[in-house]
């Protein structure tokens, strides 16, 4: 069992190269993630066990609580479909990896919005730190529950 942690911080890193795909890395405290998945799905997720049941539970949870939207010249709030790649455990945290299919259709968009409600269903003081990198330009912000959305203009 892990020691009590007095912080409730998740990190999202989005890499967006024009004409290529989106790569997303999410870092969450493992115990909180397991509790959140159980509360939302009644499934006991074990981050240390890489099996199909855990993959389905984690993928479903992330897809319900984390979304990326882009907009630009002629398009408004297009949700970027993200595919679950996998996860790994690092000490008391779990890293989750997602990516989009080819982003060749997203060349002219210059606005990105990220909705991040991960762990909001179990923690009242959850903080999300969000970093977005586009073509080498990094922008960062944070949201504190009950807020859940951050936007960047490029």
Placement of each model-derived feature along the sequence:
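N-terminal soluble domains immediately following signal/targeting peptides that reside
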Residues: 3-154
């Amino acid at each position: 069992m892990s020691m009590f942690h007095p912080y409730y911080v998740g990190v999202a890193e989005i890499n967006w190269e024009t004409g290529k795909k989106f790569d997303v890395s999410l870092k969450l405290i493992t115990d909180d993630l397991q509790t959140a998945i159980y509360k939302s799905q009644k499934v006991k997720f074990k981050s240390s066990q890489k099996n199909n049941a855990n993959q389905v539970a984690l993928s479903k949870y992330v897809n319900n609580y984390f979304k990326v939207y882009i907009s630009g010249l002629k398009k408004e709030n297009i949700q970027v479909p993200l595919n679950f790649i996998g996860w790994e455990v690092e000490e008391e945290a779990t890293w989750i990896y997602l990516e989009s299919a080819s982003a060749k259709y997203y060349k002219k968009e210059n606005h990105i919005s990220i909705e991040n409600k991960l762990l909001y269903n179990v923690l009242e003081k959850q903080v999300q730190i969000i970093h977005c990198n586009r073509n080498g330009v990094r922008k960062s912000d944070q949201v504190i529950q009950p807020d859940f959305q951050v936007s960047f203009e490029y």
